[in-house]
Structure formats: structure tokens, C-alpha cells
């Protein structure tokens, strides 16, 4: 005798049999809610929450919650931007090595900035940034280009048209430039964490080859602004 399917069950019985409910091969049925991974939301007092947030909290008290993705951590050292950079730096699926290189890079940044802090005069110590996470985020922000070039064909010819970049594309280009620079232009005896820490510190100070590469891209976009009318979207 064939087993009953979810399509042949009444709606009330179907809600109690999630194993027989297929929602595009999902392990959860539609009654499961998405997990809340924002740590700041849990620190807010209940009186400061908006009506929508209060309604979501009330629903979570009576509805089942999906499991959080394995990449999300509750650690204070967890950073989604550093996780994305680690994934881009990973080769052949060796994420353990990529995480180790990223941890050594942050440690090298911390050591170099502490040495600079102790060598600096007393009136300049406050201006020395020693937090490697702040340095990483600011360096990544300084490397992000504002405008890029897109190939568009008109009349059988291909033109490089300047186009504004989205936030994801800006972040991707900055990460790609940093990783490519550290892999291709480092000395064979220089380790990856040492080279990457140097590039991040230079980018934090608006210096180095990555900043020059960003300026070159902006100059090319400025030189091709005569083709900007080819962009119609």
C-alpha cells in the first residue's frame, strides 16, 4: 500500500506533519520563522521596539524557528565582512587555512600598531589606531571605487562606458584587488599574513598600490565620460 502524500491530507492534519510537506525541497514547512541574527535587537528594551518588532517577538513565542546558518556565530569577534573576505581568500576549499591566515593578519596589524603606539610621542598616541577590526573596515572602505567601466557595443564598436557601482560590487572589487595584490606582487619569502597586513595598513592611511589602482579606474572613467550617454539603464 502506497504511503499517503501531503497533497491528499487535510490542511489541519498537514500542519502537524511537516515531514510530508515539501516546499521546494526545504526541510522546514511555511510555519517556521526565520532566525533573528541581529545581536543589537536582543539588547533593546521591549519599550523601545517598534510595533513590527513587537509583533515578530510575539510570533516567535508560538511559532517554531529555523536553525541559524552555521556561518553565524554569537562571538564578539565574529564579523560578517571578515568572513566574506576569508571566503574570497580561500583556495581549494581549505577554509581552515584561510581562517588561520586571516587571524595571523589581524594579529600582525595589532602588533605593528602597538609598536607604533609605543614609539609615538605622548601627544600623538591618541591618533594611533590599534584596533585591527577598525583598520580592516576603514582600509576596505578606502579601497572601494565609486564608479567603474562597462563594455557596451554600439554600431559594431565596443565602448567602455562609466557606470556607478553598487555596494556589493564596490566591496567585491576592493577585496579582489587586495587579495590579488598580495598573491601576485609579494616576495617569495614573504608570508601572506605579513603582506596582507602591510597592504591593509597602507590602505588605512590612503596609501599603497590599491589606492593607486582605484584612482586609475576613476581617471579612466573620467576620460570616457563622453560615452556616458550610451548607458540607458
From Swiss-Prot:
Entry keyword set: Mitochondrion, Ribonucleoprotein, Ribosomal protein, Transit peptide
Cell location: Mitochondrion
SUPFAM superfamilies: Ribosomal protein S7
Keyword Mitochondrion on entry: yes
BP-aspect Gene Ontology terms: mitochondrial translation; ribosomal small subunit assembly; translation
Transit peptide location on this chain: 1-28
Cross-referenced Gene3D superfamilies: Ribosomal protein S7 domain (1.10.455.10)
Keyword Ribosomal protein among record annotations: yes
UniProt GO MF annotations: mRNA binding; rRNA binding; structural constituent of ribosome
GO cellular component: a single term: mitochondrial small ribosomal subunit
Record family assignment: Belongs to the universal ribosomal protein uS7 family.
Description of how the protein assembles with itself and partners: Component of the mitochondrial ribosome small subunit (28S) which comprises a 12S rRNA and about 30 distinct proteins.
Protein name in UniProt: Small ribosomal subunit protein uS7m
Origin species: Gallus gallus (Chicken)
Lineage start: Eukaryota, Metazoa, Chordata, Craniata, Vertebrata
Gene: MRPS7
